[in-house]
Amino acid sequence: RYGWRDPNWRGNVGILIRFAHPDGRQRHVQIDVGKTFREAVLRWYTAHGVGTLDAVILTHDHADAIFGMDDLRSVQRWDPKTKMSAETTRVYSDRRTLATLRKAFPYLFPTPAVERPGGFAEGRKLARDCPDCSSVGEVTVAVNGSANGAGANGANGASNGANGGATNGGGPPAAARSDSLEKFVALEQACGCAPTSPVQRYVASLQWLPFPEETTAPFEVDGLVVHPLPVLHGKDYVSYGFGFGGEGRRVVYLSDYTALLPATEALLARWTAAPDAIDLLVLDALSWDKPSPVHANVEISIALARRLAPRKALLVGMGHDFEHRAANRVLRRLRAEGLDIQLARDGELVEVPLAAGEVCMSVDS
């Protein structure tokens, strides 16, 4: 009887946030799109009546958070007349994750003169698509979509790095950063041996938006105020949790952590002081009590939940040695001390009331 409807069938961790917008249309924001994102869409988006996404927020640059990026094209609004995405999906991340995405998914950062995002297009063949290419130039592209350079060996573009810039030989496109968050650039190599060869492909139409780093300064997604929560994911790696919701109805999501950083500790201390309160707390729990260098376990997360005193807590990211029902029977004993904490299950729907309506979240464990 074991199968995807069984609570022990677990995909990569993520949550889908659904909330009412004043314009009357519901918004859908996904936190993390890991290796099993496509499965989650087929199973749980359909079950919860979700057809498209408005935005994606990424916690970090590991495979379990970003390797489903290619499948975002399947959850974008489609214009049958133009055969292109009708809208651009916003993607919020830190700079490191953005740089990793450029290397892992260079085709999701298309050059306007070469490819058009969100639909089929023709343009100059790219060096990465040409096994015989030995003469390449660089096309520099701003994240906002404006071209800053010209094609292969062109007058306005650097030829083989001669005019400087961030290059990496024949490898994947390098990433460079200017002084402004709005001026991240990607360097694309254009094919020099067949400049008129057509490119035809359909890729997701995405807008890349870095959020404030190592601080809890908020950013806004269609009226939903989101606070980044920097945490350690191992001794030397910073990942991000996220917090949102109004006073007394906070939601805190910490999917990959070993320790909280000072800025996060300070904000959560304010959110646990009356009249404020955490309504829902989602915490990492790789194992029951075994130590891990990069993840919290159940014992660590129970201790944090006791300190933050949420109305409800869910554990995610469990290894497959957990038996869902048996573990939750043990955890229910903590209700005697006023702590409601359980293992989450894939597709679980949690309703959280907010000042402006309701947020419904589907949790993948």
Feature-to-residue mapping (PLM):
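Binuclear metal-ion centers of metallo-dependent hydrolases, dominated by the metallo-beta-lactamase
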Residues: 261-365
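Binuclear metal-dependent hydrolase catalytic cores
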Residues: 1-252, 258-263, 324-364
